[in-house]
């Protein structure tokens, strides 16, 4: 007697559900870590930019013999900066990324002032 066995190849519903669950678990671990790493990188770049701006302000004030409290603008220090200085957390230009006021005041990030700041 010959049986009516048909051999089907493929995955069962349970196997597919297990694979989907594993992929979901891996994604739930990887995505928050990626977002945290990206935020930390943005913060590091912005703090480096703030240090460059502060150094440019100090060099400008020494060369121009400006006292503490003297006003400073981006136009004054532009030649002391290398390339464009923009906050990576969403800035498009220096003016919408950073605020500078006086020679003795540190520059401020407009995008994330609470976390993107120079150490005192």
Enumerate the predicted regions with their spans.
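Catalytic phosphate/metal-binding cores of nucleic-acid and nucleotide-processing enzymes, i.e., regions
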Residues: 12, 16, 51, 55
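Terminal, compositionally biased segments used for targeting/anchoring and flexible tails
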Residues: 24, 35, 44, 59-62
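Alpha-helical hydrophobic helix detector
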Residues: 17-33
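Extracellular/periplasmic head regions of type IV pilus-like filament subunits
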Residues: 55-120
């Amino acid at each position: 007697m010959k049986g009516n066995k048909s051999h089907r190849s493929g995955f069962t519903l349970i196997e597919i559900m297990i694979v989907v669950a594993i992929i979901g678990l891996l994604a739930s671990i990887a995505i928050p870590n990626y977002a945290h790493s990206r935020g930390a990188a943005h913060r590091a770049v912005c703090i480096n930019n703030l240090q460059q701006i502060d150094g440019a302000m100090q060099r400008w004030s020494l060369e121009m013999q400006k006292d503490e409290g003297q006003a400073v603008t981006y136009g004054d220090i532009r030649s002391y900066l290398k390339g464009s200085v923009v906050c990576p957390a969403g800035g498009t230009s220096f003016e919408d990324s950073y605020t500078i006021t006086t020679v003795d005041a540190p520059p401020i990030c407009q995008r994330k002032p609470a976390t993107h700041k120079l150490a005192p």
